[in-house]
């Protein structure tokens, strides 16, 4: 997908969020758009970040770590999808939010690992 198509889709999505929020008497600021960036190059992420997109979602840890390390923009990373217990330590220090925690044991491990990183 080229940059102009990416911007066009992102802009359309933002407009849909604004319209939906207005229709139910809410502010679009109450909604967080997480741009799923898996399989997209770092250049696309930095281009959207430059336009104001802050939240990005990844579900492949190795790919995400490369992007996080290379990203100079002020973004907030989300881990989306299933998280394996063996990847909890690496995930805890790289992501602001982790979606899809499916057990208390995993949540406790993330909490412990997060404390050791912070």
Sequence positions of predicted segments:
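Conserved small/polar residues in nucleotide/adenosyl-binding loops
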Residues: 115-118
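Charged, compositionally biased N-terminal leader segments and the immediate start
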Residues: 1-26
